[in-house]
């Protein structure tokens, strides 16, 4: 009789349904602590959560899955929502993520797709967050900033005026990390469109003249711009 009563109560009070994708996306972003940047959703399935992760214009989202049918479903969903480009998806092939080192602000792993943890951490930017789904919830791990990366906060490195950074990762360029607009300056033999670049706290700060490129005689439009130093 007790078993029957318990079963009756279970039927009368069903378990709560999983959170809808927009609510789940908001919860995951709050748990991550990331306020903007590049999100990669590993194991994106049909793209329902992938699309919801772009809660505002501060985020750009990319979904990855080995199942091409799921990628097609994700792309169809993104096109229907008119957000393709701001949110994208591609098929995962091989055992490496198709991303350069230190690029991603939030790596959301719903299904590891056979990718190991060192490879996941490789693509995270310093300060980036890895959220991994488990049977009991989501585990959070932060990639700490390496001690051998330095800031350049003044014209000559820092307030001391000594133009030597304490940075052992600086070296000749080996790959293109990211591209940021505008692609052309206003003129080739006048004042540079970009000047006074400094860095601090994982950000690049610079002054950019975004005035018309039709003629250098037109008024300038100087702007102070801040970008993520690792992915723009």
What is each stretch, according to the model?
Residues 74-75:
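Conserved SAM-binding loop
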Residues 167-190, 213, 217-232:
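Extracytoplasmic/lumenal domain signature
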Residues 34-51, 58-62:
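Conserved class I S-adenosyl-L-methionine
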Residues 145, 150-181:
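Blade/loop signatures of beta-propeller domains
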Residues 158, 203, 210-212:
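Residue-level signature of beta-propeller blades and closely related beta-rich strand-turn architectures
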Residues 115-129:
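A short glycine-rich, Lys/Arg-flanked "PGG" loop and its adjoining helix->strand segment in the class I
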Residues 82-94:
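Conserved SAM-binding strand-loop segment of SAM-dependent methyltransferases
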Residues 95-106:
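A short acidic, Gly/Pro-enriched loop at the edge of an enzyme's catalytic core
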């Amino acid at each position: 009789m007790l078993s029957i009563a318990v079963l009756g109560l279970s039927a009368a009070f069903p378990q709560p349904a999983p959170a809808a994708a927009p609510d789940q996306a908001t919860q995951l972003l709050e748990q991550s602590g990331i306020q903007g940047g590049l999100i990669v959703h590993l194991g994106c399935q049909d793209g329902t959560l992938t699309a919801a992760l772009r809660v505002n214009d501060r985020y750009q989202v990319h979904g990855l899955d080995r199942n091409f049918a799921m990628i097609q479903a994700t792309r169809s969903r993104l096109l229907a929502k008119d957000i393709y480009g701001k949110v994208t998806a591609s098929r995962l092939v091989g055992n490496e993520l198709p991303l350069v080192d230190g690029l991603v602000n939030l790596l959301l792993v719903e299904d590891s797709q056979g990718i190991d943890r060192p490879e996941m951490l490789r693509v995270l930017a310093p300060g980036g967050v890895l959220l991994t789904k488990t049977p009991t919830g989501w585990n959070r791990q932060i990639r700490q900033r390496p001690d051998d990366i330095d800031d350049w906060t003044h014209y000559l490195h820092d307030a001391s005026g000594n133009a030597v950074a304490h940075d052992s990762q600086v070296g000749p360029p080996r790959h293109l990390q990211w591209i940021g607009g505008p692609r052309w300056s206003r003129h080739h033999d006048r004042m540079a469109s970009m000047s006074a670049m400094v860095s601090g706290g994982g950000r690049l700060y610079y002054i950019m003249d975004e005035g018309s490129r039709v003629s250098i005689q037109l008024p300038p439009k100087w702007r102070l711009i801040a970008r993520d130093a690792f992915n723009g």
